[in-house]
Amino acid sequence: MFVNLHTNSYYNFLNSALSPKKLVNLAINDQQKAVAITDPNLFGAVEFFITCKQNNIKPIIGLNLTVEYQKNDVKLLLIAKSNKGFQTLNKIALIQQKLEINSLVDQLTDIAVIICSLTTWKSTYKDVYQAKGIEINQTPIAILANAVNCEKTNSDQVVLTVLKQMKQNQTGKITTFDWDLKQKLNQISINENLKVKSEIQPFLDQKTAQQLFSETELNNLNDLVNRCELDLEHLKAASLSLTDNDAAVLESLCQTNLKQFLDKNQDLNKKAYQLRLEKELNVINKLNFASYFLVVNDLVNYAFKKDILIGSGRGSAVGSLVAFLLNITKIDPVQHQLIFERFISTHRQDLPDIDIDIMENKRAEMINYLFEKYGKENCAQIVTFQRFKTRSAVKEVAKLFNDYGISDMILGVLPKDQTITFTDLKATEDSALQLCLQQFGLIVELALAIVDFPRQSSIHASGIVIASNSLIKTIPLLQLDNNHFLTQVSMEWLSFFNLNKFDLLGLINLTMISDVITQIKPSNQTVNQFLNTISWTDQNTFINLVNEDTLGIFQLESFGMKKLLVQIKPKTINQLAIVLALYRPGAQDNINLFINRLHNGYDQSDIDPRILPIVKNTYGVLIFQEQIINIVKVVANYSLEEADSFRRAISKKDVKLIQKNKRNFFERAVQNNFDLKTTTKIFSYIERFANYGFNLSHALGYALLSYWTAWLKTNYPVYFYLWLLNHFQSSKDKQKLIIRTLEKSGIEIYPPLLNKAQPNSVIENKKIYLGLNLIKGINDRYIQNLQKVQHLIQTQNNLQLTDVVSWCLDKTIGDIPLKDLLLLKTMGCFDFFEYTYDFNDAKDFWIKSDHLLFTRMPLEKKDSNFWIKQFFTN
């Protein structure tokens, strides 16, 4: 039985056309019992292992490595013989520099080592092995320890198999096309133009292998394969545990916080909250998730302690009372009738997933806190992969053919669907597309073939994993420049190891909210305390939104959003959530229906009275997933957990799955006294909207965040716009829009006066004084020098304009070129004098005062067009 043992996947970036799934399919199609992945990294190892197990193929995981021996590079293939061997590979993969072979051997445990070239073997080890009296050509297996003076390593730990006896083949492809594709990927990686096709190196099938290799050689190969036994299931991380009894600690925290909450809100139904809390804790403890909530609670407490602003909540976690009581979210799920089962359910074994929005400029601090608290080796950020999209694939392949300009034409006729295949394209009747394929079919075919191929690794924007012990025992890692670890396993495969994932998303809007509140809050209040005093029902805030005053408002700046705000005219957070939920692909098809019913009413008799209360607030239009869950619960008497499972099944658009759930739904609906006609109508209603339903929990969390920004803009507009001016300094278009909006708002703008101007814009007496950073052509060095001039201005008595100009031009002080000095004058930087001046003879005016033409021009407000012209016109 032959096994392809030296195989690269496409995680050896731009060096293979084979995904882990394709590797496994090759083995299946040829009835090979095993297959290997041996990239120079372990990015694809876990995906490969899981795919093999799902298809009854034996997975062999290896690492392609270049080591140094006597100042020569030697290519080795390290194969994990066991879970311990896989952990050894993890340790080696963490070392990101070339190893000397002696130091490598010191680390090898349960590893088979294969020399990748017999020529390399002979030239590199000839002297060593002759001295040891070993006949290479007659010895199918040699002990590496004897070759490199590491006698402590025994043959069960390190085995080096001579390739003359194994003739191990390196995988290239299934077909000629796949090998061609590999060559194109190689050329993309080194930015080369198209070369002559290389020799085809096929993925060997059983028949060919039997012809090429002797029985002894195949037996040696099978002997090695049989000794490789991986079961990564046994490497799954132990459950995260923070205390002796995390469940009891969590319950105590929640009960204490619930009592405080109810004491402040005496009118609430205490029993309803208590029952809800007990239900949630029961599910959380049953699934052993208490520690997860305690970690997030501790992180939130750290944020409050440091006055770091976190978001109002995102995703289905907003539907949890436990999360609300732990200050992880800000929306009361009982009052807003949110569904916990949408977040966590005993019907799903998924680990909880709480996404936390934090201030963008504090994310690194929060991550450092986690690494310090739980241990550097127990935490890691998560890898992600930048993959080819249709656009980038077409451009790169066209470049290989020296057809730089043709890519735009091809992209102009290609469908936007990222999943479309070349076969699909050939079957279309679009004449322009067919003409394109006739002329550039090879470019299109190759480009579509590499869509979704990984191009390089990167760091996931938010994900972090935390374990109870060292992650290196479980998964492969890399080390980042800041000494933090990065997983070599991407997000979608980490759940296999039972690792707790946390998402910390940096949000610039939270930074803005915090910065603005810092300017306006009383000195004895924190930012978080001030935020808690903001009324959620300020009608002036909603009026401004309806008046399309949404510049700088979270999620509401686009033209479409402004139009929808005018049409719906929200007056509450809940109505704002509807706006956010409707303005999405798919859901937008319901906007006209909703608007029409909102303003003109609708026939409620057309809706079964038993489900009318569920859809009444959205005028009979299904907008939220929670509505579907509640309808299914009422009609078919499902539990909330069952109803959410039903919703998930329907939204997947899997015909077989839909039919299976449909039968069960109808049976239970009839048992619950719904007739067939009504049930059919309701099911059709659900099926139509299920794919577009939005998560109400998420919509409310983000609606509150939108409201916070709108409230600050309405009540403290000067500070709000000041932040926008300073934040968007690099965007001229944004700056123009801000300045024009300032004028409409009646806020006065003044020039960056040289006697007090700061690099950034500042507020004084409710007026905005523009910053030096906004002046075109004035760089950081100029600003530093102008601050020297400013110091002299502030300390000089009997100040004269000629003094200031002299300091500006003096190479030891200001060193400002004359043309830039004139720019400062035009910008009004000298307007702090009683008079301003018209510089007729600019070259000599600062020396000879009689060359100055005095024109009385008191400091005055300029209109927006003046500032836009001066700041942004080159």
UniProtKB/Swiss-Prot annotation:
This protein's UniProt keywords: Cytoplasm, DNA replication, DNA-directed DNA polymerase, Nucleotidyltransferase, Transferase
UniProt GO MF annotations: 3'-5' exonuclease activity; DNA-directed DNA polymerase activity
Locations listed in the record: Cytoplasm
Keyword Nucleotidyltransferase (UniProt): yes
Entry GO terms, CC: cytoplasm
Keyword field contains Metal-binding: no
GO biological process: DNA replication
EC number: 2.7.7.7
Family: Belongs to the DNA polymerase type-C family. DnaE subfamily.
NCBIfam families: polc
Function summary: DNA polymerase III is a complex, multichain enzyme responsible for most of the replicative synthesis in bacteria. This DNA polymerase also exhibits 3' to 5' exonuclease activity. The alpha chain is the DNA polymerase.
Quaternary structure and interacting proteins, as annotated: DNA polymerase III contains a core (composed of alpha, epsilon and theta chains) that associates with a tau subunit. This core dimerizes to form the PolIII' complex. PolIII' associates with the gamma complex (composed of gamma, delta, delta', psi and chi chains) and with the beta chain to form the complete DNA polymerase III complex.
Protein name (record): DNA polymerase III subunit alpha
Gene: dnaE
